[in-house]
Amino acid sequence: MAKEKFDRSKPHLNVGTIGHVDHGKTTLTAAITTTLAKAIGGKNKAVAYDQIDNAPEEKARGITIATSHQEYETNNRHYAHVDCPGHADYVKNMITGAAQMDAAILVVSATDGPMPQTKEHILLARQVGVPYVIVFINKADMLAADERAEMIEMVEMDVRDLLNKYNFPGDTTPIVYGSAVKALEGDESEIGAPAILKLMEALDTFVPNPKRVTDKPFLMPVEDVFSITGRGTVATGRVEQGVLKVNDEVEIIGIRPTTKTVVTGIEMFRKLLDQAEAGDNIGALLRGTKKEDIERGQVLAKPGSITPHKKFAAEVYVLTKDEGGRHTPFINNYRPQFYFRTTDVTGVCNLPNGVEMVMPGDNVSLTVELISPIAMDKGLKFAIREGGRTIGSGVVVDIIE
């Protein structure tokens, strides 16, 4: 069967659920798809909870590890939705997921209020540059009707304080309360389906249409690579900037020597595209490229537009112990992992002259030398990680070599 073309008539946004484990992120994602399928119809399809929580090794532990992509639309917009992992061990995936958001829906349980991972995810959203956050206070059905208003008001105040603390506009952020479970059951009371529609309205109105960087040269970080029998190798990822047309030449840059190839096909949500633009999650079919020739962490880019580098100057913020960072300072020649776009690369830190050590909570200018080159430009953001947790975040301020 021929694949249908992807419809671009509505503005497209990438959103995702963030928040503490078991506060209801995946249930909310299911409730959004189900409620919109009923209320608006159109292309909306109800997606069940266990379809979203679908990677097999995760279900055993009842926690979402991978990021799952869903799509839905309101009357005004088309949304691609990532359900982000909530568990602390999987912050790495959160970094790959959250980096892809134009907005995040922070889910907070009405019975618990903000918890450690609520803070961690707001901080991460700030670090990886999620521009807008809106809030859904979930599990309102667990509160006695006579206590509900008072309890929710307390949780709301806590959440607004937290958002302000991490430089989001806590005072003006839309906060909607309800019950994702009730909405999934088709409940029409104010905490059921109507709460979900109210949340969607907040998403439509509070978050402006993102300004896409379509005029910059094409660049797509590679997230995954697989081969399709008889067709060739497909690289998937989110287009970071620019436009890609079928039959465009691209370079594969970073980690290994740079190579060139031609894109012979582009797909998004299993539909064929003539061209992809910034913000699209796509698969690009690459002519004559073997699966072994390309890996996660490389980028596809317009030839000549970006080069791989190992050594750069960076401005770095080192997390405090309370933010989940190191408990002790680090010294010259510290060797953590640097998380660029979709992968970790080990690098050596050189401290500025006269600086003996860097304390948690410090801002510092570092020179970093990576063990393999990464496609980079000034302004590229990264996380610094050690033993599976984020201990700092930074930005490339100058390329040295």
Curated annotation (Swiss-Prot):
Keyword Transmembrane helix listed: no
Pfam families referenced in this protein's UniProt entry, alphabetically: GTP_EFTU (PF00009), GTP_EFTU_D2 (PF03144), GTP_EFTU_D3 (PF03143)
Gene3D superfamilies documented for this protein: P-loop containing nucleotide triphosphate hydrolases (3.40.50.300), Translation factors (2.40.30.10)
Catalytic activity field: GTP + H2O = GDP + phosphate + H(+)
GO terms of molecular function: GTP binding; GTPase activity; translation elongation factor activity
Superkingdom of origin organism: Bacteria
All residue ranges annotated as the tr-type G domain in the record: 10-211
Residues binding GTP, per UniProt: 19-26, 83-87, 138-141
EC number: 3.6.5.3
Chain segments carrying region G4: 138-141
Region (G2): 62-66
G1: annotated segments: 19-26
Any one cellular-component term (Gene Ontology): cytosol
Cellular compartment(s): Cytoplasm
Presence of keyword Mitochondrion: no
Location of the region described as G5 in the Swiss-Prot/TrEMBL record: 179-181
InterPro entries: EF-Tu_GTP-bd, EF-Tu_GTPase, EFTu-like_2, EFTU_2, G_TR_CS, P-loop_NTPase, Small_GTP-bd, T_Tr_GTP-bd_dom
Region described as G3: spans on this chain: 83-86
Residues annotated as binding Mg(2+): 26
UniProt-listed CDD domains: EF_Tu, EFTU_II, EFTU_III
Family: Belongs to the TRAFAC class translation factor GTPase superfamily. Classic translation factor GTPase family. EF-Tu/EF-1A subfamily.
Role this protein plays: GTP hydrolase that promotes the GTP-dependent binding of aminoacyl-tRNA to the A-site of ribosomes during protein biosynthesis.
HAMAP family: EF_Tu_B
The protein's assembly and partners: Monomer.
Alphabetical list of PANTHER family matching this protein: ELONGATION FACTOR TU, MITOCHONDRIAL, ELONGATION FACTOR TU-RELATED
Protein name: Elongation factor Tu
Source species: Leptospira borgpetersenii serovar Hardjo-bovis (strain JB197)
